[in-house]
Amino acid sequence: MRRTAMTQTILAPLDGKVFQVMVKPGDTVEEDEEILVIEAMKMETPIFAPCDGAVKEIGVKEGDDVLENDILAVIDSKSNEV
């Protein structure tokens, strides 16, 4: 079995303000783990990790304004291949 790494880029699904960041570069995350929250129109939208892996970078900090499709984070995912 061979292990390969893929990079997953997490984009903002909507315009808003970064309300909370729960992870930092180097942290290990699991698929569907909440990694940050965006606030828009007084509603909080959680952002979840799309895969298991390690946080490579966080492109935002709490209080930042973001636009739809801005890069929020990058995760190095691990996948197994036979």
Residue map of PLM features:
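Short histidine-centered loop motifs in beta-beta connectors
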Residues: Q20-K24, E57-V60
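Short, well-structured beta-strand-loop connectors
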Residues: K24-I35, E62-L72
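Short, compositionally biased
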Residues: F48-E57, E81-V82
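Glycine- and charge-enriched low-complexity intrinsically disordered segments
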Residues: E68-V82
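Short beta-strand-turn/beta-hairpin segments enriched in glycine/proline and small hydrophobics
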Residues: M1-K17, E34-P50, S77
